[in-house]
């Protein structure tokens, strides 16, 4: 019997979503500090047979937590104890910023979705970098102690709101300079709808010099090749999706994260009352309604790029079956986030058990 849905309804459904997130994350970190997280990890951890080798990295499993949950690397170790094979930190910007005014996070409970216009609220790259370094050190020590594979830690970087588009590349380079030395991989986020003008950076004339600058800086400051990916929006036309894929291939990027949240409200099959959705205002919608388009983009990218790009699929992932569907469609890695808010702290563990059953049954 699953108790979390009833607990969510009683404890969180009446609460401001952002406050609920803060309290829930605090609970996860408390479990870690008290040693409960270590106990939980014995039942949530993926099987050793679930390991995947991607971008020169070994992931304990193909399923991880998307950017947006742990924006400042304040609970990375705690999150890995819940069973995620990787955690993507961020989005982190070159400068600290408070994000957009509240309220800025809204639930569509009937659709198991959320609308957010957070606006990259974060502490800035210079504050986050030492936390990432500390998390990696702790995870490495735990890996030695337990003999289990260390979860992978990626970092997602975005543009500071106060920085103009003409200076965007320099802002991304600033983040790269301090974060790349500690990131297992880097994701360039040019697809959030909540920073004015950001999605214009998906246009090839703007994206090419930005990615070249980030690649060069990552190589310069690390002395190693840090895997580099770009995260795209589901709202791109198909021809623009393939154009970004061609650019990624041209520049030697490692992969594409597909997709971010959508600004669409029509054509998603929403069950929430139209007026209630409209009352939420602007922002990116994530969760179950994004599943179809996210899968479409994944299949399009796989058909276009074949094995030449690593594809990380995110958007509408809730169950182990969803994860397997994305892997079968060509994803190397799969991420989730919104379902975590509805499914609770044992969500990744349930997905790992589902993947384990599927492997035993030869699926």
From Swiss-Prot:
One Pfam family assigned to this protein is DHO_dh
Its localization reads: Cell membrane
Identify the GO cellular component terms for this protein. Answer: cytoplasm; plasma membrane
Residues bound to substrate are 71, 116-120, 189, 194, 260-261
Q: What is its EC number?
A: 1.3.5.2
Signal peptide positions on this chain: none
| Record's protein name | Dihydroorotate dehydrogenase (quinone)
* Provenance organism: Kocuria rhizophila (strain ATCC 9341 / DSM 348 / NBRC 103217 / DC2201)
